[in-house]
Amino acid sequence: MRICIFGAGAIGGFVAAHLARVSGLEVSVVARGAHLAAIRERGLRVVTPLGEFAARVRATDRAEDLGVQDLVFIALKQHQLPAALPALATLLGPDTTVVPPTTGIPYWYFHGLGGAHGGRQVDRLDPGGASWRTLAPERAVGCVYWAASTGLRLLGGHRGDRAGSDPPRRQAAALSDR
């Protein structure tokens, strides 16, 4: 089974890494910039309270190089979706299933509903109906991506105020790393 995760940030990378551990799945990601370079160089690394692992996946910034997929996970923020539709279209065949999570009401929300709002398309959710046409609602599987996290470790960078002083907040931040 060919699976593409379109958007390899925190959520997309997490999903891709776990799927890559399943035998028989051909997992690829569409990423860009520093994420793409890091994935190509080091793979995807997941650290959880139960352990950590690394996974290698095919990574590209050109979706059209991947060909038609059986399953496409869209791991973009909702406002990024319209610009990504042309690239997403290159991954879709007649039997491709799409998993398009969203942080709000999805474009396909009214698809298949009866009553006064059945099949309604809301321009505010899907300007011009582009998502509806490209990612036909009958191929969509609704879901919510959710991963619990209990902490964040700063691995580098500057802290403190712009003046370079050493206020109590900065001292507290430094102590929290120990």
Regions found by a protein language model. Give the residues of each.
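Short, hinge-like loop/turn segments at secondary-structure boundaries
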Residues: 45-48, 115-119, 166-169
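Generic preference for hydrophobic
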Residues: 29, 59-60, 98, 177
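NAD(P)+-binding Rossmann beta1-loop-alpha1 motif at the extreme N-terminus of oxidoreductases
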Residues: 1-48
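A broad, low-specificity signal marking well-ordered, structured residues that form hydrophobic/aromatic
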Residues: 44, 57-58, 175
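Nucleotide donor/acceptor-binding cores
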Residues: 1, 70, 173
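Active-site-adjacent segment of FAD-dependent monooxygenases/related oxidoreductases
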Residues: 49-52, 56
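Conserved anion/nucleotide-ligand pocket segment
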Residues: 157, 163-178
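Rossmann-like NAD(P)(H) cofactor-binding subdomain of soluble oxidoreductases
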Residues: 53, 61-161
